[in-house]
Curated annotation (Swiss-Prot):
Protein name: 3-dehydroquinate synthase
Record family assignment: Belongs to the sugar phosphate cyclases superfamily. Dehydroquinate synthase family.
Stored InterPro entries: Dehydroquinate_synthase (IPR050071), DHQ_synth_AroB (IPR016037), DHQ_synth_fam (IPR030963), DHQS/DOIS_N (IPR030960), DHQS_C (IPR056179)
Subcellular location: Cytoplasm
Organism per entry: Blochmanniella floridana
Cellular component GO terms held in the UniProt record: cytoplasm
Keyword check for Cytoplasm: yes
A single MF term (Gene Ontology): 3-dehydroquinate synthase activity
EC code: 4.2.3.4
Keywords: Amino-acid biosynthesis, Aromatic amino acid biosynthesis, Cobalt, Cytoplasm, Lyase, Metal-binding, NAD, Nucleotide-binding, Zinc
Family annotation (PANTHER family): 3-DEHYDROQUINATE SYNTHASE, 3-DEHYDROQUINATE SYNTHASE, CHLOROPLASTIC
Reactions that this protein is recorded to catalyse: 7-phospho-2-dehydro-3-deoxy-D-arabino-heptonate = 3-dehydroquinate + phosphate
């Protein structure tokens, strides 16, 4: 079964195609490319041995001219130097503005490819082909692109929408257990932020997801893409309601920055950040109930995700990174916090002492 979601935003419209086997030549009719197009597949040295030849051969079978650029794997490579490597290859081969970039990989590859597409000759087309659960449900949708900096995550970037997102659920079968569970953190975030019924479904179906049950995966990924689409079409450029999707990210990005974008995966950092947001909401009072907080904690634990930050990181270590967060203004920390499961709110100028106490006393 193939499912389609259309994302209509001010800068255009594009499909999210979800199904099994989309990298195979039999499904090329679903792709937003045609005979004679020139595509450059951007991938990494971990994904390339598994999927590059399959996609390359599918394109060639359809007379699509294909080149490739293979980058090193890892969040630490989401950098200006890797961006420059992509741009240098495109320029050295005289690729013009009709070239289409194809991001074959997880969130790092998607963000790098999208950013390269946004700046190369002032903008060319690109396609997202997410191969990780996290990228399939979140990073590949919505047009956010960019790279990290020593001073913070995603501090250099742009908005540039893909012309399509091709979600091949077969790719999930080759993920490590850690990579798969990392994606579950963003799925749980969606449920806590936006959809209490979906949270109930996750409580009842998490074991099926962990077993890679096809029907459960299809529903889960499709629902997350629906939720992301519903927010993006209202706030394409992240000026308002889209910030609710950053639930847990202010804390999580602090963890990633502190650790130099290594040791912890993005999903692991977001899971811990989600619990810190829950703890902060409890410390402020009048927001999320203790009962809901426990449900969130238990679901994260069942997914084998962290519910607190790294031991070597002290509460005060978070603050310097949180102040640099894109939601913060004039040195004041603004946070997305849960009011209940399925409802969130942006809180302005949250007291630093409350944040420190919430991180220190996160074990609810």
């Amino acid at each position: 079964m193939i499912k389609r979601i259309i994302v209509n935003v001010k800068t255009g419209s594009y499909p999210i195609i979800i199904g099994y086997g989309l990298l195979n030549k039999d499904f090329m009719s679903y792709w937003t490319i045609k005979n004679g197009d020139l595509v450059v597949i951007i991938t990494n040295d971990r994904v390339a041995p598994i999927y590059l030849n399959r996609l390359y051969n599918s394109f060639n079978a359809c007379e699509i001219v294909t080149d490739q650029c293979i980058l090193p794997d890892g969040e630490q490579n989401k950098s200006l130097s890797m961006l420059n490597k992509i741009l240098t290859q495109l320029l050295s081969k005289n690729y013009d503005r009709d070239t289409i970039l194809v991001a074959l990989g997880g969130g790092v590859i998607g963000d790098l490819t999208g950013f390269a597409a946004s700046v190369y000759q002032r903008g060319i087309r690109f396609i997202q082909v997410p191969t990780t659960l996290l990228a399939q449900v979140d990073a590949s949708i919505g047009g956010k692109t960019g790279v990290n900096h020593v001073f913070g995550k995603n501090m250099i970037g742009s908005f540039h929408q893909p012309i399509s997102v091709m979600v091949d659920l077969d790719c999930l079968c080759t993920l490590s257990e850690k990579e798969f569970r990392s994606g579950l953190s963003e799925i749980i975030k969606y449920a806590v932020a936006l959809d209490s019924a979906f949270f109930n479904w996750l409580e009842n179906n998490l074991d099926y997801l962990l077993m890679l049950n096809p029907q459960s995966l299809m529903y889960c990924v499709y629902r997350c893409c629906e939720l992301k689409r519903s927010i993006v079409i209202m706030d394409e450029f992240d000026q308002g309601i889209r910030s609710v999707l950053n639930l847990g990210h202010t804390y999580g990005h602090a963890i990633e920055s502190y650790l130099g974008y290594s040791q912890w995966s993005h999903g692991e950092a977001i899971a811990a950040g989600l619990m810190m947001a829950v703890s902060t909401a409890l410390h402020i009072g009048g927001l999320i109930s203790f009962h809901d907080a426990i449900r969130i904690k238990l679901l994260l634990k069942r997914a084998n995700l962290p519910i607190c930050g790294p031991e070597e990181m002290k509460p005060q270590d978070y603050i310097k990174y949180m102040i640099r967060d894109k939601k913060s203004r004039l040195g004041r920390i603004n946070l997305v916090l849960p009011k209940s499961i399925g409802k969130t709110q942006v809180f302005v100028n949250v007291n630093t002492d409350v944040i420190l106490n919430a991180i220190e006393n996160i074990d609810i």
